């Protein structure tokens, strides 16, 4: 079975519900969780159930649940997984923890070297075509001998940015002079459907 099939066919096990294992609620304090654990640990402790592998496995699950829910950092991570609706086990999700929530913006030339489980789309997307370099491509007045007001690779031409990124408005033909060259806040808000 492939990883994709495992995710599609995943059914959450009752053993992954740490709150249910300890017979407590999501709002239970660490003291309440500890008290519930003690009652259940006495019932399933390996010393009381010698040779019973099922009771030993249950005791290990209870111990893991207690350790996770009594540690505030681990509990926050567990609650994030529990409420996310992600179709993978908690242990599998923990194994991918360093990837979760990371958003990297890759340039066209950069390789994608890590998986990511972050589904939020970044505000700025990669360009379809890479930025062209060189003085000839930059246009007049932007060459290497320009004053400090010239454009450099660190400060690209604002006309090449999207309107949503605060770039200049697009124009075609000779209409540039009619609307004015300045980019006002009201015009930007209108273009971005904010008013």
Curated annotation (Swiss-Prot):
Q: Which UniProt keywords apply?
A: Chaperone
List, in alphabetical order, the GO biological process terms annotated in this UniProt record.
chaperone cofactor-dependent protein refolding
Q: Which gene encodes it?
A: jdp
Query: Membrane spanning segments where?
Result: none
What name does this protein carry? J domain-containing protein
Q: PROSITE patterns of this UniProt entry? A: DNAJ_2 (PS50076)
Q: Which Pfam families match?
A: DnaJ
Please, which domain of life does this record's source organism belong to?
Answer: Eukaryota
Q: Name one GO molecular function term.
A: unfolded protein binding
| Tissues expressed in | Expressed in the head.
Taxonomy, top ranks, is:
Eukaryota, Metazoa, Ecdysozoa, Arthropoda, Hexapoda
Gene Ontology, cellular component aspect: cytoplasm; cytosol
Q: Which residues form the J domain?
A: 17-82
Which organism is the protein's source? Drosophila melanogaster (Fruit fly)
Q: Does the keyword Lyase apply?
A: no
Region Disordered, residue ranges: 126-163
């Amino acid at each position: 079975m492939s990883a994709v099939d495992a995710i599609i066919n995943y059914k959450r096990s009752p053993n992954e519900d740490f709150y249910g294992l300890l017979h407590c609620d999501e709002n239970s304090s660490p003291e309440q969780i500890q008290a519930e654990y003690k009652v259940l640990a006495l019932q399933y402790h390996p010393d009381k159930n010698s040779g019973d592998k099922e009771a030993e496995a249950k005791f290990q699950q209870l111990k893991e649940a207690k350790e996770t829910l009594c540690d505030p950092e681990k509990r926050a991570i567990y609650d994030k997984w529990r409420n996310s609706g992600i179709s993978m086990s908690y242990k599998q999700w923990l194994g991918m923890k360093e990837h979760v929530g990371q958003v990297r913006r890759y340039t066209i030339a950069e390789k994608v070297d890590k998986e990511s489980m972050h589904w939020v789309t970044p505000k700025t997307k990669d360009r379809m075509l890479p930025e062209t370099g060189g003085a000839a491509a930059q246009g007049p007045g932007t060459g290497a001998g320009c004053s400090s007001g010239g454009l450099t690779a660190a400060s690209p031409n604002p006309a090449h940015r999207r309107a949503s990124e605060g770039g200049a408005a697009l124009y075609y033909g000779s209409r540039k002079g009619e609307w004015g060259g300045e980019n006002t806040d009201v015009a930007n808000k209108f273009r971005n459907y904010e008013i």
